[in-house]
Amino acid sequence: MKTFLFTFCLVAIFGSSSWIGTNSVWMELSLLTAKLPEGWNLPSYLSAIVQIACLGPLIYSIIHKGIKMTIPTVPLIFIFMVLACICQLGLCFFWDDTGYIFGAIRSWPLYLLLFGLAIVDAISSVLFLPFMAQFHPSFLNAYFVGMGLSALIPSLLSLIQGTSNYWCDDNKTPHYYPPRFSVSMFFLINFFFTCAAVAAFLVLYKIGAHKNSSQVEPEPKHSIQIIQGDSTTDVNEVNTESSFQETSSIPDSSSATGARLAFLLLTTALVNAQMNGIVTSVQSYATLVYSQNTYHYAVTLSNVISPLASYLQFFVKIRSLPILAFLTLCSSLTTAVIIYLAALSPNWIFNSETAGTIISIASSLIAAGLHSYLRVMFAALLREGNQKESRLFWCGAFIQIGSFTGSAIMFPLVNVWKLFHSAPSCR
């Protein structure tokens, strides 16, 4: 039990390195835009840089799968994690440096360092996930819990820092309070978290946890298995011993049809398009129109829900494709509500600030919970059976494909055609 919990914590810390770099920059945007010459155009430039970095997984996939070149996974993971540490440390000292690019003053050190972080974050989907195939299946949940922490840690730090606290004068002009600690200190704290992730990875490799795939997790005493049978869906409450017997009766995913595999991969892409591309692009428009606190509660509580929902797979395991399809539909409808709220900005839904606040926060939490749970459940199903490392590679690839597609769709809508409009801070 102690060994399991120790390994679980190490995997979660390792998983937190997946997107903490990019998320840390995003959570500082309110301070960065006030200081840097790009102003509120800065998010558009940074979004473009992150999307260019998404070419990293494509290049890796071509080398690994197309050319069939054998790439040593462990050294490569270590190199990328060290690169993330270097870029995170560089942000502490050079985030506000500028220089001339094509005759205009640009924050090119920030561009370069974010590009390095985004490369690591993007390629983690196709590099870190296959590495997790060597662990016991329960530790895949721990990895996704860590992915949730990669958003939760920067958002909590941002709340403590007080990046967007302000008061309004009689002329409806916002005046921002100074942050409790500087941008450099914020990036330094995230640097230490990234170093902790590197240390966790090295300890995992040193103790050989990835080779001990027979390590059994303590199954919850009462877990719910929802399984797709030949013609019915059964729900059974089982204890530890009967849980393994029931699991063994499930057809091995290696014999699953191509349609089942295609469903899992395509829904993985769809869920991640909503989670990492669509919601993140419009959430500020859907919440800031009601208040700054509404935005902070929506973002922070969503980041709390995400790792908790990832852990839910320990207790509720759904293998029925119709039920998973229904949950995916529910997540899509919730995402549609967020888009609708964003499209209404700067107006309130039902002309009510209270109703809008409740709906915007609730929809953000429901979407975050469903997206996180479905992402873990799809990965767990893809991991089952033979060729689990290859299946998790394609799971990671479709996570990145979905995220890129969602961002690519929303970028012109938000930044080119400007279909969404921000509300004044004071009204």
From Swiss-Prot:
Query: Could you say what a knockout of this gene produces?
Result: RNAi-mediated knockdown causes a severe reduction in the number of laid eggs; the few laid eggs fail to hatch.
Q: Which Pfam families match?
A: SLC52_ribofla_tr (PF06237)
Can you state which reaction this protein catalyses? riboflavin(in) = riboflavin(out)
How is activity influenced by pH? Answer: Optimum pH is 5.
Give the UniProt entry's GO cellular component terms. Answer: plasma membrane
Residue spans, topological domain Extracellular? 24-42, 95-111, 161-184, 283-297, 344-353, 413-427
Stated regulation of activity: Activity is strongly inhibited by riboflavin analogs, such as lumiflavin and lumichrome.
GO BP annotations listed: embryo development ending in birth or egg hatching; riboflavin transport
Where exactly are the transmembrane stretches of this chain? 3-23, 43-63, 74-94, 112-132, 140-160, 185-205, 262-282, 298-318, 323-343, 354-374, 392-412
How this chain sits in the membrane, per its record, is: Multi-pass membrane protein
Tissue spec: Expressed in intestine.
GO MF, one term, reads: riboflavin transmembrane transporter activity
Predominant localisation class: membrane
Where are the Cytoplasmic topological domains?
A: 1-2, 64-73, 133-139, 206-261, 319-322, 375-391
Q: What InterPro entries does this protein map onto?
A: Riboflavin_transptr
Q: What induces it?
A: Down-regulated by high levels of riboflavin.
Q: Where in the cell is it found?
A: Cell membrane
Which terms are listed as keywords in the entry? Cell membrane, Membrane, Transmembrane, Transmembrane helix, Transport
Q: Which domain of life is it from?
A: Eukaryota
Task: State the similarity comment.
Answer: Belongs to the riboflavin transporter family.
Reported function: Riboflavin transporter. Riboflavin transport is Na(+)-independent but pH-sensitive.
Q: What is this protein called?
A: Riboflavin transporter rft-1
Gene this protein is translated from: rft-1
